[in-house]
């Protein structure tokens, strides 16, 4: 399955959290209004395979159509135990259970309540016993349920009992490749796997591929530091190849000493043989988290930093008000007043939380009118328990 199909299936699984209508006035005598979500509170579920953390799952407050919940696939080890860690923090979990179904959801294979688990410092640790009812190299659906009072949170992944698929070797290869891209002295071995040609754009770090130069793959002149450990997600497992994604955040120091943040995603399609690992495809995307520093404005241009050219934006008919979406945030710029406002953000103000800083939610701008009013929709995974769809706060 290629990367575009993977993303399409992810989008098919997201659901509408809330529709937010926001109006902000650009006159200095009127306060700007912004819509904020509460900080993320719903637990995340982390799965493990051979002591490697994989496939961090985010909860759905509604029951989804599991047929379309194909974002990740989780290998089951030979002991038929699936270790999980629930990062629940202050969110009370009254009961933990799971079910296993056929991929079309019609056949229920297991429906089990987990009685044996430990809970300490806001973390639940458990081993899910997977019944000896799975065929090797066949995919099934695993749905984990967390009961909280009258509410149930649902977490979805595919599972497989891999045979001769070499999943751990593929993960280790991807992690080693990733680390070597930051090692200028030890990166020469990566050239073995690259296929440079003229199809790659070697002028930007926003999109790097197997066809890029080794210089681009090793970050060219960018002097960044990895802020978060790469989050490993497995997208495909079979005898021919495995697909591994690594997500992480890097930081760098800007020209004026300000700290810059970048979301990075690496895509690996690899094949194992007895002789060596083959890299069938590699892609890396890099997107700067917009911070609205003074040097982001240059003449009549607004500089968004290193990012994809595919930016969601809309303006009013006269072009005096421009709204755009950047890495989970909605910004609006008044060209007449030369004022920039952050209208909405999934992120809180304290650091970068993986529940807020992921790509399974987004913002769509509906319209921008001449008065400076912008209508937009927020959609994707629900990371907070919402009793009211929106709330309003003042921005100075």
What positions do the PLM features span?
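Beta-propeller fold detector
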Residues: 341-348, 396
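Short, aromatic-enriched amphipathic alpha-helices that serve as compact interaction elements
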Residues: 166-190
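Short beta-strand elements that form the blades of beta-propeller/WD-repeat-like
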Residues: 312-326, 331, 371-383
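Single conserved hydrophobic/aromatic residue that forms the stacking wall/gate
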Residues: 384-395
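Short solvent-exposed beta->alpha transition segments
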Residues: 185-233
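Structural signature of eukaryotic scaffold interfaces centered on beta-propeller domains
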Residues: 305-318, 359-373
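Short, compositionally biased P/S/T/A/G/V-rich stretches that sit at domain boundaries
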Residues: 24-77
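Short beta-strand edge/turn micro-motifs at domain boundaries
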Residues: 31-35, 42-44, 59, 107-108, ...
